[in-house]
């Protein structure tokens, strides 16, 4: 919006390091009508008018990008992508979301269409300010009140990187990239797989050049050209010369229009055909069209990677068959509980830290699954207990946590740490508390995912995979009713291999990974022991957690419903692929806990033979990144494996990225991150070839 004359521009330069977020400084000023107006302290510009901000958003960005008509004319399963420069208060998102919901009610063919709203913000509005700013809007427009509530519930912590918020019931995906706009735009990969994603409409809503000239650079307009195609539109409040020249230089045809109810002018633009003709022909294979949109896919492997991949594909309208030679969660993913807690890194590295990005998305997704579980009257997927890290084994000091939002990680007083943990006799001066961390129930997760109407599960041992021009043919075997092996052939549009360390056996293009055996231990504490054991999950040189048995636990791990349990994890045996239960590894788990918390030596039962345990095989690459993407020289065969010990934290975001790549959409991971995850990355294959040559010698 144009800068009010009374609002002076702040020219103070930020000294915040790159990739460390500096939240917006909100100043409240009173306009001529007596309304409180939120103003950016950084740029001296109003976010929007409290009197008619929503109407202006509809007029400038929705109407002048022809969104009512363009969205109504989407074909089934088509995805429309909007990119907004300047998320601000989320007003444009809310206006677009409101329109999208209205259109879906009156246009049944939009039931399977999707809206992808990508936005960037360098100085995001803190949660408390955002709630205050949007409250009057919700009061005046009850239809928006529900959307505001959903946005605030999902609003991410203010750390750099992409935060994906899925509003699944509305087929709306919101990607909020926090950080410099140039970095965020550069992170969008327009060359993934065989499809070229593109932006359909641009909302240029950054503060006016008179306040924020640094935003409107040649690089911004160059990225717009790279990410657009013929017919891509743009709209902005500003008619400043720097914006007009920037758009024209990149092939946009511009036009001035009047702002609703005002003498002020605004700008619209359309990418010309000639500009698109300058691009290589190969880059013009746009998003998946109805003719080549995959109808079905097969996922091989029913562990956490396979289940989450199936979920992401099914949510995009693809019929998914999950195949596994064993029952779901029979491998390393089937422990009684999985600890979901952030693996902390210095905050200036978080922008490209897969575990941090994945942890935040996983938490949001699992909380959505909790809602579905409540409807199905099944156990919660995520029990948000909070987790206390005793900082026994860490590469980060508490001083490096100070810039993290308290909702993600914070240090607490020793007294409070003792109170929430129940460890009254333990010195907890050094600690890190993660309030949104907790325990994932794998069996409950499987139940919710396999209940999706687009997902089916079948037990089948895959013997052969053959790719043709138009499909992939799978041959497998299974026991028939007479206990004989019967052969079965399945044809699919796409296949995703999620078979952990056995992935290499299914396709040699998937590098052979490191195998690490891990055994988790648990026991049933007495009532007296329960009063003395930790009351929430703890991280030390291992980890431990109390939990209560739920329905489904008996089937997978022989744990009775409503029975208290205490688990300890986990052993780490390199190169061992046997999954027999071993007393010596139960002892190792016991010893790690007692070494770090000797106060519990008199509490834990020391007869290890009475403990229960489960062993699984983790799969890990030499560079610790999973294998996610399309296999070399293939158009239909994908890898989603090698999650290591972090599957429940990183599989959801990796599955989203894979599904987006398959369908030619922008992913929530940067181009650099996708390159590091590629199953074809050169560094990984060079290491593998070197080790193979050494073995032969």
Swiss-Prot record:
Subcellular location: Cytoplasm
One GO CC term on file: cytoplasm
GO annotation terms (biological process): methylation; tRNA wobble base modification
Region annotation (tRNA (mnm(5)s(2)U34)-methyltransferase) ranges: 1-272
Enzyme Commission number(s): 2.1.1.61, 1.5.-.-
Keywords, alphabetical: Cytoplasm, FAD, Flavoprotein, Methyltransferase, Multifunctional enzyme, Oxidoreductase, S-adenosyl-L-methionine, Transferase, tRNA processing
Annotated segments matching region FAD-dependent cmnm(5)s(2)U34 oxidoreductase: 300-697
Catalytic reaction list: 5-aminomethyl-2-thiouridine(34) in tRNA + S-adenosyl-L-methionine = 5-methylaminomethyl-2-thiouridine(34) in tRNA + S-adenosyl-L-homocysteine + H(+)
Cofactor requirements of the protein: FAD
Highest taxon, organism lineage: Bacteria
GO molecular function, one term: flavin adenine dinucleotide binding
NCBIfam families reported for this sequence: MnmC_Cterm (TIGR03197), tRNA_MNMC2 (NF033855)
Role according to the record: Catalyzes the last two steps in the biosynthesis of 5-methylaminomethyl-2-thiouridine (mnm(5)s(2)U) at the wobble position (U34) in tRNA. Catalyzes the FAD-dependent demodification of cmnm(5)s(2)U34 to nm(5)s(2)U34, followed by the transfer of a methyl group from S-adenosyl-L-methionine to nm(5)s(2)U34, to form mnm(5)s(2)U34.
UniProt similarity note: In the N-terminal section; belongs to the methyltransferase superfamily. tRNA (mnm(5)s(2)U34)-methyltransferase family.
Name assigned to this protein: tRNA 5-methylaminomethyl-2-thiouridine biosynthesis bifunctional protein MnmC
Classification lineage: Bacteria, Pseudomonadati, Pseudomonadota, Gammaproteobacteria, Moraxellales
């Amino acid at each position: 919006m144009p800068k009010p004359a009374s609002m002076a521009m702040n020219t103070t330069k930020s000294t915040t390091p790159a990739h460390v977020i500096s939240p917006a400084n909100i100043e409240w000023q009173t306009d001529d009508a007596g309304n409180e107006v939120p103003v950016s302290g950084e740029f001296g510009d109003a976010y929007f008018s409290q009197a008619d901000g929503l109407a202006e958003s509809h007029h400038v960005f929705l109407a002048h990008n022809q969104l009512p008509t363009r969205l109504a004319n989407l074909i089934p399963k088509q995805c429309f992508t909007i990119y907004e420069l300047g998320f601000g208060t989320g007003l444009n998102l809310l206006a677009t979301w409101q329109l999208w919901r209205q259109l879906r009610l009156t246009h049944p063919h939009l039931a399977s269409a999707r809206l992808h709203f990508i936005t960037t913000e360098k100085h995001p509005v803190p949660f408390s300010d955002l709630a205050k700013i949007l409250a009057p809007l919700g009061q005046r427009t009850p239809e928006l009140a529900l959307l505001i509530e959903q946005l605030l519930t999902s609003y991410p912590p203010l750390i750099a990187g992409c935060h994906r918020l899925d509003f699944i019931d509305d087929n709306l995906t919101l990607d909020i990239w926090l950080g410099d706009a140039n970095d965020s735009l550069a992170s969008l990969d327009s060359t993934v797989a065989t499809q070229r994603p593109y932006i359909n409409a641009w909302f240029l809503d950054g503060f006016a050049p008179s306040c924020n000239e640094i935003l409107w650079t040649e690089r911004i307009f160059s990225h717009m050209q790279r990410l657009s195609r013929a017919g891509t539109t743009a709209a902005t409040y500003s008619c400043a010369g720097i914006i007009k020249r920037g758009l024209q230089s990149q092939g946009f045809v511009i036009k001035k229009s009047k702002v609703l109810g005002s003498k002020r002018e605004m700008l619209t633009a359309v990418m010309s055909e000639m500009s698109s003709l300058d691009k290589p022909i190969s880059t013009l294979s746009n998003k998946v069209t109805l003719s080549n949109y995959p109808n079905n896919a097969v996922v091989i492997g029913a562990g956490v990677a396979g289940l989450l991949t199936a979920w992401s594909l099914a949510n995009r309208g693809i019929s998914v068959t999950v195949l596994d030679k064993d029952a779901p969660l029979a491998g390393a993913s089937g422990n009684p509980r999985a600890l979901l807690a952030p693996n902390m890194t210095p905050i200036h590295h978080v922008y490209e830290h897969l575990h941090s990005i994945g942890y935040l998305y996983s938490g949001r997704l699992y909380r959505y699954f909790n809602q579905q579980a409540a409807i199905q009257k099944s156990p919660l997927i995520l029990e948000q207990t909070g987790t206390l890290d005793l900082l026994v084994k860490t590469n980060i000091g508490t001083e490096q946590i100070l810039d993290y939002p308290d909702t993600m990680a914070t240090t607490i007083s020793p007294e409070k740490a003792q109170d929430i943990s129940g460890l009254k006799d333990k010195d907890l001066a050094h600690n890190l508390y993660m309030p949104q961390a907790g325990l994932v129930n794998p069996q409950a997760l499987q139940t919710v995912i396999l209940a999706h109407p687009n997902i089916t599960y079948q037990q089948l041992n895959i013997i052969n995979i053959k790719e043709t021009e138009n499909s992939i043919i799978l041959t497998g075997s299974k026991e028939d009713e007479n206990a004989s092996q019967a052969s079965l052939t399945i044809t699919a549009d796409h296949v995703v291999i999620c078979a952990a360390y056995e992935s290499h056996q299914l396709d040699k293009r998937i590098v052979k990974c490191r195998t690490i055996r891990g055994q988790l231990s648990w026991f049933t504490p007495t009532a007296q022991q329960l009063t003395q054991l930790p009351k929430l999950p703890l991280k030390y040189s291992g980890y431990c957690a109390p939990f209560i048995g739920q329905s489904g636990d008996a089937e997978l791990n022989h744990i009775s419903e409503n029975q208290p349990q205490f688990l300890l994890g986990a052993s780490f045996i390199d190169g061992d692929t046997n999954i027999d239960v071993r007393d010596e590894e139960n002892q190792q788990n016991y010893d790690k806990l007692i070494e770090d918390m000797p106060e519990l030596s008199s509490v834990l039962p020391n007869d290890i033979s009475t403990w229960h345990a489960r062993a699984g095989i983790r799969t890990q690459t030499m560079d610790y990144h999973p294998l996610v993407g399309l296999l070399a020289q293939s158009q239909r065969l994908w890898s989603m494996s090698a999650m290591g010990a972090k599957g429940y934290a990183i599989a959801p975001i990796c599955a989203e990225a894979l599904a987006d790549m398959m369908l030619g959409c922008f992913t929530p991971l940067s181009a650099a991150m996708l390159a590091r995850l590629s199953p074809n990355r050169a560094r990984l294959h060079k290491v593998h070839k070197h080790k193979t040559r050494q073995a032969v010698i």
